Amino acid sequence: MAQGHKAFAIFAHAAQAVAARDLAKLGLFGHSTGGGAIFEVAATDPRVKCAFGLDTWTEPISQDVRATPLKVPFFSLRSAQWALNHDEKARILAELLAKAKGPVYDQYLIDSKHADFTLMPLLSPFAG
């Protein structure tokens, strides 16, 4: 099978898998900047019923969302490195979690550190 046909078959299978799901009830997961992105979506999309942020980074969260309490359950699991860091980003996350209307579970792992990773080397030979 040619590469293009193989890629198309993978996307067709993924589309079938998504179509079989109830997209009116979404749960989201995000790490680091992705954690901020899922916080933003969870606050603005009524289909989202819960969210799990792993070392949530608050930079992508808009001012509009910061002003509005989150209404869905949010589980925050942080590294000790970030949970015990009292910088601006940690303060923003603490404020967001404190004013949330839905249940919030905020935990951190003792002696843990934030892990950074990127897919850029897989997307471009110039990135790796």
Please state what every model-predicted region is.
Residues 34, 43, 117:
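Active-site-proximal loop/helix segments of hydrolase catalytic cores
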Residues 21-24, 46, 70:
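Structured loop/turn residues at beta-strand edges in well-structured enzyme cores
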Residues 17-20, 42-43, 66, 98:
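A general structural signal for stabilizing positions within well-ordered secondary structure
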Residues 1-29:
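Gly/Ser-rich "nucleophile elbow"/oxyanion-hole loop immediately N-terminal to the catalytic nucleophile
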